[in-house]
């Protein structure tokens, strides 16, 4: 579908005939497409775990009840089958991941389950990965939804992009409860929900394979006691380029205090950005209701979030990596709290990166506004728009 809005155009990813990527649990997924058939393999297996093959059936993919019949579009519904005696839900999710990476331009995909995969229907429907459309002629004709997949529907805990979740899914399946809390600082005076505790420093909080650069991107809760983390953070903040935007240059004592304050502050968490384990930059995610930005902007919800980012290493700069890092930070925010409706940021208005934010990301530049230390641009990414148009590849 067309994703052009306010200067942003999503670049489509076209997978090669044989395509390989890695899941967060290090499982290797390989898919091969030939003559319209997609076969999906795991690890070094010589036999496919899943096969999506052409089928005579077509299903309407235009929204039912919205689009007039004379405008409605239908698409062929491939048959989803397997050579396995029983395909696990974990592997079914991996197979759908591989399929979506070959159909990045689609919002929904029709599928027909056969006798080998019909047992997966409860998993697909009850998790929201798929639904049975009105024009289905059998209960095993489904539409799978891309936005649902990227929101983590049906994702196995060990393969989920969000790592070290709080609350831990093994101890609680409910979201963190809504308990009124209060923050009073120099710039903030507000009630807000009590925030969940942060994962331990050094814990990976997000991991995703970035297909455009063929590397694994991770976000790790920064650990100031980790010599590699601290040395990199200090070097980046003391560089001329980063200091223009962040203005945190100083001795080690200043950096240690900054990171200690971040660790003690429940509303904000610092993360190390890495590519295949190589440290690349630093970012922060925060609950914006009790952030100074929330005070000066106003109108933000109890669960809305904000991000900050710096790319410290020159070799990890560039459009595709920058877009992937920003997209991943937004993705992590929306995944960690399903009640988050918007994620915002406030870069300095005079930074050269600002015009590129509209071109690279599905966000709006709302306005310029004043903060005590800078004139900033207020950017907004909305949940629905993100999962419709973000470049999650």
UniProtKB/Swiss-Prot annotation:
Pathway annotation: Siderophore biosynthesis; ferrichrome biosynthesis
Gene Ontology molecular function terms on file: N-acyltransferase activity
Enzyme Commission number: 2.3.1.-
Keywords of the record: Acyltransferase, Transferase
InterPro entries reported in the protein's UniProt record: Acyl_CoA_acyltransferase, Acyltransferase_MbtK/IucB-like
UniProt keyword Acyltransferase present: yes
Principal EC category: transferase
Gene3D superfamilies recorded: 3.40.630.30
GO biological process: ferrichrome biosynthetic process
UniProt similarity note: Belongs to the lysine N-acyltransferase mbtK family.
Function, in words: L-ornithine N(5)-monooxygenase; part of the siderophore biosynthetic pathway. Omphalotus olearius produces ferrichrome A, but no other siderophore has been detected. Ferrichrome A consists of a hexapeptide ring made up of one glycine, two serine, and three N(5)-hydroxyornithine amino acid residues, the latter acylated by trans-(alpha-methyl)-glutaconic acid residues. The biosynthesis of ferrichrome A depends on the hydroxylation of ornithine to N(5)-hydroxyornithine, catalyzed by the monooxygenase omo1.
Protein's UniProt name: Acyltransferase ato1
Originating gene: ato1
